[in-house]
Amino acid sequence: MQTSLKIAVVGSGLVGSLLAIYLKKAGHTVHVYDRSPDIRKINFSGRSINLAMSNRGWKALDGVGVGDAVREIAIPMDKRAIHLVDKLNFQNYGQEGESIYSISRGTLNRKMIDLAENAGAEFYFEQKIWDVTLSDATLHIGESERGEWEERKYDMVFGADGAFSRIRHRMQRQSMFNYSQEFLNMGYKELNIPANADRTHKLDKNSFHIWPRGEYMLIALPNLDGSFTCTLFMPFEGENSFESLTDRKMVEDFFEKNFPDSIEVIPELANDFFKNPTSTLVTMKCFPWTYEDKIALIGDACHAIVPFYGQGMNAGFEDITVLNEMIEKFGDDWKKIFTEYQISRKPNADAIAELSYRNFMEMSTKTADEKFLLQKKIEKVFSDKHPDKWIPLYSRVTFSDRPYAEALAIGDFQNGIMEEVLKLDNIENIWNTPEVENKILELLQK
């Protein structure tokens, strides 16, 4: 147990709530602030890509004994269902029994706040933080930026307030603070596949559904109530874009042509399309993440990524796992804890940002590409035979807790091998033969 401190966590989202549980269990007084109303008392909809919980997320939840409470609201998905225009393909994610888990962001966030309150954390909603004094961890709270502010002093402040973090914004005014953000030229919009009348799912509920169409794509993840949360990813401008779909008929014609099997399961398509906002996708990087032993950024506040590997929440939760490891290692030496935390996490945050961007290219174009599908089949056969020699990149990221940076490096090495293998004569017919197996073994020796 550490010496008890008075700690503020800014942001009551998933990472902020879980961090509050960890800090509370370590013996601290924890106050969680959020500028928004209590999510448990309002309807939550319109801009949520469902979450895909995988190993790193479960490890962090199980680390404070709340994993089973979250498993109750999660649906396992053991495969991709790839909806081509004229056929449906299934592609298993990992080994037998390996799944990612679909969870509604709103449902999970409510659950996490309940769990944090039960652990003893105190929540303060509709509290607007306009500034923080870094040197003495003082929050400045008020109704407006130009009105009167109240000061609340803490021993330490954690910024878990997302990609557009107010705490980070204050740190950016420091000398030698590096910061970059990059928006994709595409956005996303939420749509909904309702449940059948008997509350069953209209599509296979244990699949991550994806309609890959190159520059744009549709995905759907299952919810407990029998519905699916769908997300349409499209460029903002251009021929096939949000800008180009200006009336109901254009939207319906576009879906009829490009996602024909989705039309019958999205009855409110046009209404959803024009009612729900179009949201942006941003990658944000910065460094340092900490200030002395007073301030630390965590989760999206220091490494926002695009959602195409389903790792945003998992990476944020893993920040907490690593922070906790440093707490156990260095006790009350918070300066050392913060330094080691950011040194450990920064290269891995950069790696998952890169992997997420690349996976967008994979999901949107390659899942419909015959050569890519052949590569996946060859990798699967070889990996099943030689699990000690080949763990596919997706499995390294999703079903292990080895560092993201290691997964990126090994994935690049494996990809180089597969490029050579796919050049073999008649590979389409000999892919599942000793010749191909031996070629991979030979290339692994180099």
From Swiss-Prot:
GO terms for molecular function: FAD binding; kynurenine 3-monooxygenase activity. The keyword Nucleotide-binding does not apply. Its EC number is 1.14.13.9. It catalyses: L-kynurenine + NADPH + O2 + H(+) = 3-hydroxy-L-kynurenine + NADP(+) + H2O. Its cofactor is FAD. InterPro entries: FAD-bd (IPR002938), FAD/NAD-bd_sf (IPR036188), Kynurenine_monooxygenase (IPR027545). Keywords: FAD, Flavoprotein, Monooxygenase, NADP, Oxidoreductase, Pyridine nucleotide biosynthesis. The keyword Oxidoreductase applies. It comes from the Bacteria. Pathway: Cofactor biosynthesis; NAD(+) biosynthesis; quinolinate from L-kynurenine: step 1/3. GO terms for biological process: anthranilate metabolic process; kynurenine metabolic process; L-tryptophan catabolic process; NAD biosynthetic process; quinolinate biosynthetic process. Belongs to the aromatic-ring hydroxylase family. KMO subfamily. Catalyzes the hydroxylation of L-kynurenine (L-Kyn) to form 3-hydroxy-L-kynurenine (L-3OHKyn). Required for synthesis of quinolinic acid. This is Kynurenine 3-monooxygenase. The gene is kmo.
